[in-house]
Each structure stands twice: as C-alpha cells, then as structure tokens.
Amino acid sequence: MSGEYFSQQNGVYIPKGILPDTSFEKLYLLVRQKEQRVYSNAEIVNLPEIATHHKQHYEWSVRKDSCKSLIRYLKKKNQFLRILEIGCGNGWLSHKLAEIPRTEVIGLDINLTELQQAANVFTKSNLQFVYGDIRKNILQNRQFDIVIFAGSIQYFSSPTEIIHLALENLTARGEIHIIDSFLYDAKEVEAAKQNCREYYREMGIPDMANYYFHHLLNDMYQFNCTVKQQRTSFFKKLFLKRNAFPWLCIRHAL
C-alpha cells in the first residue's frame, strides 16, 4: 500500500487522516468473547482446523469445506489474481488465499484489534491487512480480480449498495464471491430478525442486533449472479450436517 495514503500501525495499513471508530468493534468483540470466538495466535494460525471439543467445531467444519471449495475454484483459473476479502476478521481466510500461487491478497476490516492480530500472525509477502470501510473509497478505486465476502455480508445494511461498490473495485472479468452467510426467503426473514434480537438480548448485548442485517436471497438476483452452491434446507442442515449457506458468484452485467 502506498505510503502517501497509508500509515502502518502494528502491521496494519490505516488510511491517513482516518481515526479508527471503535463503537462497532467493542460490541463485536464482546459478542465474540461470549460466543468463544476470540482465538489465540496459536489457534488462528491453524484455522479452519480446530479442536474437536471446541464449542465452534461444527461451524469451522463448515467453513473448512467452503474454504476448500473456493480455493479449488480459484486455483483452476491458473492466473495471477488480485484478491480482496471484505470483512476479513482475524485474517485466517486471507492467509489461506495468499497460499494460492500468483496471488496478491488484501484483507480489509473495521476491527482493528483482529486486524493487528492477523498482521502479527500472518506475515506472507503477498498479504496485507488494511483498516477501513470500503464505502469510504479508502482503496482509491483499486481494481481486484476477486472480491470475497466470507461471513461478512450480513454486517452491511444494504446489499445493493455494497455489491455496487464492490463492482466498482472489480476488474472487467472479475468476480465477487459471497460465502458463509445466511440469505433468506421472504417468508422466513421476519422470524430470523426476531430470533436475532432475542439472541443478543439474552446475551446481554441487545445493541448488537442493530449491526446485524438479514438479507434476501432474491435481492442478489438483481445482479449478474450465479449460484455456485444452493443453500441447504433446515432439514438437511440438521440431520445431514450439510452447509446451510449458499455460495454466490456475481460478475459485471453482460
């Protein structure tokens, strides 16, 4: 990243003139602590592998499968790829993506605590971690071949807005991939919202519900969207232990 526009803090690139906003980060980290999703350096370096007795083992088995599928797909392109992961968290997936030959990867997030941990643990020369919100054009319209939302699209209030912005940062033949997030049918979204509010209220952090959004799968079809993997029904998820998340690929309009 250019020293003209960015400074470094503990290995993380921060746009000059931007002061980190910790309002969301504090709530988010508090939730993650209660959910046992704050990991040590020794743990994140091995993700998505995690101890079988860990509370989040099933979740990570799902993420392991989606990670493998995505990396297999990207490797088949057999070309140089500039990759942007929006909402990279502790950086485990960005690190895995950077292991693909001929890639340059940027992990972007507004959680400075996890970004600093990521920069400390994952130090590959083709991997950088950047603090900031893509909606503020902090990347100066830099172009990427692949933009990934992995378990992060639900933290953006408007999928239409964020996908349009991602498309602006996408090369002509580039792709946006959305994985590891629930996308709902219209008939189930209100119940999901209510369950979310109750979940955070019972946790003692009700304000977190204001930062978690429930997007409709149908809203994604306004774009040039291909379903790489269908979402799994509740029955199959419960009894067959299959990934309940869809995998969507969005390209520029034809």
State where each predicted segment sits:
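A short, conserved alpha-helix within the catalytic core of class I
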Residues: 156-166
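N-terminal auxiliary segments of SAM/dcSAM-dependent transferases
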Residues: 1-37
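A conserved beta-strand element that flanks and buttresses the S-adenosyl-L-methionine
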Residues: 148
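Conserved alpha-helix/loop element of class I SAM-dependent methyltransferases that forms part
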Residues: 59-79
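Short alpha-helix
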Residues: 208-226
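Class I SAM-dependent methyltransferase SAM/SAH-binding core
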Residues: 92-136
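Conserved Class I S-adenosyl-L-methionine
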Residues: 190-211
